[in-house]
């Protein structure tokens, strides 16, 4: 019985390795990374109108992926709100939600508006292009449209400010 289990585990491992390798080949080059040109997108916002990344051409832009059920995202909201209040006019902060309904997000944003732009990536198409694997995730895009930072986890107001200032050239 132990030989059978051992052979089965080896087969599963081999199939898994081939599956991972195949997936890597298929998805290679299909997402952006630090140092790449940011993928331009057009997504709906809270009022239903569309916002494009190119609307912010020539500005340092911060993208933050979040979810309403995400505890670290909720902890991060006061820091994001403080950044938006203190630096949002100079460095736009765009909040992107993937896969949740507008009604659900409206409940969250009522407490955390602070003039932030909230966008909806319903089918996670843009999230996949940006290689978003969780939330919160933050991207800093420089004035030339290049992704300069990709950070997984909650951020602070000062982290955001320091990144934005660093790429404000």
Predicted features along the sequence, with ranges:
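Short, internal strand/loop/helix patches
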Residues: 94, 106-144
């Amino acid at each position: 019985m132990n030989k059978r289990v051992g052979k089965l585990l080896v087969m599963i491992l081999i199939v898994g390795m081939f599956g991972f390798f195949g997936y890597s080949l298929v998805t290679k080059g299909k997402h952006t990374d630090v140092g790449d040109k940011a993928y331009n997108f057009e997504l709906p916002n809270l009022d239903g109108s569309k916002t494009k990344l190119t609307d912010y051409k020539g500005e340092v832009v911060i993208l933050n992926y979040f979810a309403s059920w995400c505890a670290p995202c909720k902890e991060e909201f006061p820091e994001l709100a403080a950044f938006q209040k203190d630096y949002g006019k100079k460095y736009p902060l765009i909040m992107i939600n993937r896969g949740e309904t507008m009604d659900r997000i409206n409940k969250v944003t009522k407490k955390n508006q602070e003039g932030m732009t909230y966008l909806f990536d319903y089918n996670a198409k843009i999230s996949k292009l940006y290689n978003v694997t969780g939330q919160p995730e933050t991207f800093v895009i420089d004035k030339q449209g290049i992704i300069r930072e990709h950070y997984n986890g909650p951020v602070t107001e000062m982290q955001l400010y320091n990144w934005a200032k660093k790429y404000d050239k």
